[in-house]
Every structure is written in C-alpha cells, then in structure tokens.
Amino acid sequence: DLVMVSIIGSHDGTTAVDYTVNCAIGYPNATGYPDDPRPVNNVVPAWDLMCGQMAALGLLAADRYRSQTGHGDLVTLALTDVALAAAGMLGGIAEAQINQTERPSIGNDLYGAYGTDFVTGDGRRVMVVAISPKQWRGLQEATGTTPQVQELASTLRVDFSDEGERFLARDKLTQLFLP
C-alpha cells in the first residue's frame, strides 16, 4: 500500500533540470529586449516550484486513492511535462499554432497591460505597473499626464480603461510617463 511520487527530468527518462528545461521550452528567447537577440534566462526556478506543487497534489490524490481502495500508487511526474503544461496554460502553444508566429520579446514590459521600468534620478531602476482602474488613474495623476493620456487615446481612437489597449500603446504611453 505504498504511496510514492517519482519526479524525473523528461518523460522518456532522460535527465533534465529546471534551467535546461527552461531553455528547451524556449522562454529565454521570449524574454529580453526586441532589439537584442541574446536569450535572457530567468533566475527563478519556476518549473521546480511548479513541479513541487504538482507533486504534492499528486501525492494527495494517490493517498486518497489508497484510502478508498486499500491499494498503493506510484505517481510519476516529469519536469519537462510540468513546463509544457504551464506553457499551454498560459496560451503560448495555442497562440503559436493559431497565429503561426512566435510572440515577440517585449523587454521589461508587462504582457497584456501597462507596466515597464524607468530610470530614477539617482540611476536606479523602478518597475511601474498599472493594471486596475485605480492604479491607472494613480499613475496618470502621479505623473501629471492625464490630459496627454486622454489626447493620445483620442488620437489612437482607443479606450485606455481597457488594459489590453494600454499594452498595445505601451511605447507611446511610456514616452508620456518619462521623467
């Protein structure tokens, strides 16, 4: 009645670790800046973190199976499958298949809404993100750009209350918010 979780690198039994899986999935090519072709790796071992959570869930499911049937179970989880599942859940696989194109690198911009980094007066960098309506209003008020943002929205014929529209116009908006 043993309940066990076995974490392997790849589904075929070959070795893989978080950083090699990250490269194989292609995320280092998706990060970075559009004008710089170098891949940028992520320092957060995301696949390891997700794999741990999935392993814990698998262990709970196997334990429940044992309590209901009296039989043990072996849950095998491949790190590469975790990464592929995550890429699928985030829409990256379907987007590439449907649009027949790769999502371009967007640097430090936040995908799908407005967010980017700015250099401060003392040469440091700060990340600014405005997703909610309150955050969006606050950013405009803090930078004193409400009239300019309204004028830009009118010129582009968009509604910046929609965060997707803010994402599409992020370069023009960033120019307004620059100190």
Range-by-range predicted roles:
Residues 1-130, 138:
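Active-site-adjacent "lid/gating" segments in soluble enzymes
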Residues 114-179:
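Aromatic-enriched alpha-helical interface/lid elements that frame and gate functional surfaces
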